[in-house]
Curated annotation (Swiss-Prot):
The keyword Ribosomal protein does not apply. Residues 17-33 have a biased composition (Low complexity). It is a multi-pass membrane protein. Keywords: Cell membrane, Membrane, Symport, Transmembrane, Transmembrane helix, Transport. It comes from the Eukaryota. Cell membrane polyamine/proton symporter involved in the polyamine uptake in cells. Possesses high affinity for spermidine and lower affinity for spermine and putrescine. Transports paraquat, a polyamine analog, and thus confers sensitivity to this chemical which is used as a herbicide. Belongs to the amino acid-polyamine-organocation (APC) superfamily. Polyamine:cation symporter (PHS) (TC 2.A.3.12) family. This is Polyamine transporter PUT1. Residues 1-76 are annotated as: Disordered. It is found in: Cell membrane. One of its GO terms (biological process) is polyamine transport. It comes from Oryza sativa subsp. japonica. It holds the Pfam family AA_permease_2.
């Protein structure tokens, strides 16, 4: 155990709960996601003072202490949490999907059959395991640090910071997509938005308006997400009904394995079916997260898959195939072919509003992640400051700045770069998930994936293989840029420790957070920069 060097010791709480039955398949685990275990006995809390001083976050099996009222342990009382079930489902929907806008490249890259198979198989291989991990660890650590705290408590604060850096950067890159998609859908009706100064001004204006919406608070964002979600999906429901008489099932079976752009195909599928863990950085704002978060994830998985397959089947089955036309924005053209100009304008309007929903949901996740990291002492304290609406102002401004810097990249470049960074972060999450199971098998888990440790390892084999494939298929340019970004994070954490030691910026730990390690004063001058 590391020497504390005169730091104040804190008592840690070991929470034990009854065991949960294990299942044998991922499908059974996914079904269980729909109902969090609410029949547990109240966990008993025993004080356990380490013999040689308290350990830093992530060492010696320190555990997260739950609230005594049965709510999943969190830094905020239930009365201060504002996000309920329905808004949470739509926030997850927009974190992950937002509708079928952007899935067109999967058909252009691989044809109808592989696109349909991809959106049926990848949710089982990737989305369900990621949602299950998020349900268990998000309920176990219901604070705004989310996956940063999962990794920090398992691997230590250095790797927790790396997780936060890669995931935040990936999220900001992801958010830079939405102005691009928004303008791609509008440029057929407003050609001036296709490039040049009008496009640049449109990106800046849109980013400013949506950033202001985030500033007004999660309650506003959540209910706006519901309204946008309903409006954005309605035209596809209508398009599917119009397409019924024109469907030719044989068109769904078209495949040409000799003409597949595997890199574009996998990156498009992966981008449209990941980011289930992003909602964890809002867990500190969710009402009764131990019950609400797993249920919301269950419903959101079904919601997302149906929202992709329904228009994909309608578009590929009712319109003769021209793979060259299947690029982002093509659903508006399909709507015009099937229903006329009125349906095309409706789809374009829905795309615009959907991108607004995805933007505000992603920015909420990114900005609250920075707040959560600051509350754990990983970032300067000004990131933890909240506006009068309870929102993280510094995190919002930093995230918006990143979006503006990256929004001039092309759609495909953005997708490939964010997927590369996201993969590294997911590998750390997988390791943290297994380590928590091995080191803390009896820790309180309001929701527990109904698999034993061996079953959890088996569940993670397919997604790990998928990550390897996505990384292997990345272009040299994307790999160099992404690895450069990773290297920046490796240097940035020691640099921040140096700044802390010099007292150039203030760092602090929120005392209201449950204890998962040492609450320490600023770094001592003789402390190593990297733990």
């Amino acid at each position: 155990m590391a020497d504390t060097g005169g730091r104040p010791e804190v008592s840690l709480a070991t929470v034990r709960s009854p065991g949960h039955p294990a299942a044998s398949t991922t499908a059974a685990a996914a079904a269980d996601l729909g109902h969090a275990d609410t029949g547990q006995e109240k966990p008993t809390v025993e004080s356990a003072q380490p013999a040689n001083g308290a350990a830093p976050m992530g060492e010696c099996g320190t555990e997260y202490r739950g609230l005594p009222d049965g709510d999943a342990g969190g830094p905020m009382p239930s009365s201060a949490r504002t996000v309920s079930m329905i808004p949470l489902i739509f926030l997850i929907f927009y974190e992950v999907s937002g509708g079928p806008f952007g899935i067109e490249d999967s058909v252009g890259a691989a044809g109808p059959l592989l696109a349909i198979i991809g959106f049926l198989v990848l949710p089982v291989i990737w989305s369900i395991p990621e949602a299950l991990i998020t349900a268990e660890l998000g309920a176990m650590f219901p604070e705004n640090g989310g996956y940063v705290v999962w990794v920090a408590s398992a691997l230590g604060p250095y790797w927790g910071f790396q997780q936060g850096w890669m995931k935040w950067l990936s999220g900001v890159i992801d958010n830079a997509l939405y102005p691009v998609l928004f303008l791609d859908y509008l440029k057929s009706g407003v050609p001036a938005l296709g490039g040049g100064a009008p496009r640049a001004f449109a990106v800046v204006g849109l980013t400013a308006v949506l950033t202001l919406l985030n500033y007004r608070g999660l309650t506003v964002v959540g209910w706006v997400a519901i309204c946008l979600g309903v409006f954005s999906l309605l035209p596809f429901f209508v398009m599917g009904l119009i397409a019924l008489p024109k469907l030719r099932p044989a068109r769904w079976l078209v495949i040409d394995l000799h003409n597949v752009d595997w890199n574009l195909y996998l990156n498009t599928l992966f981008w449209n079916l990941n980011y289930w863990d992003s909602i964890s950085t809002l867990a500190g704002e969710v009402k009764n997260p131990g019950k609400t978060l797993p249920k919301a994830l269950f419903y959101a998985v079904i919601f997302v898959v149906v929202a992709y397959l329904y228009p994909l089947l309608a578009g590929t089955g009712a319109v003769p195939l021209d793979r060259g036309q299947w690029t982002d924005g093509y659903f508006a053209d399909i709507a015009k072919l099937l229903g006329g100009a009125w349906l095309m304008w409706w789809v374009q309007s829905a795309a615009a509003l959907s991108n607004m929903g995805m933007f505000v949901a992603e920015m909420s996740s990114d900005s609250y992640q920075l707040l959560g990291m600051a509350e754990r002492g990983m970032l300067p304290s000004f990131f933890a400051a909240r506006s009068r609406y309870g929102t993280p102002l510094a995190g919002i401004l930093f995230s918006a700045s990143g979006v503006l810097l990256l929004s001039m990249m092309s759609f495909q470049e953005i997708v490939a770069a964010e997927n590369f960074l996201y993969c590294f972060g997911m590998l750390l999450e997988f390791v943290a998930f297994i380590l928590h199971r091995v080191r803390r098998p009896d820790a309180a888990r309001p929701y527990r994936v109904p698999l034993g440790t061996a079953g959890c390892v088996a569940m993670l084999v397919p997604p790990t293989a998928l990550i390897a494939v996505v990384l292997a298929l990345s272009t040299l340019k994307v790999a160099v840029v992404s690895l450069g970004a990773v290297a920046m994070g490796l240097v940035l954490q020691p640099a921040l420790r140096f700044v802390e030691k010099k007292r150039w910026l203030r760092f602090s730990v929120n005392p209201d957070l449950p204890e998962i390690g040492v609450i320490r004063p600023p770094a001592a001058p003789d402390e190593p920069l990297v733990p």
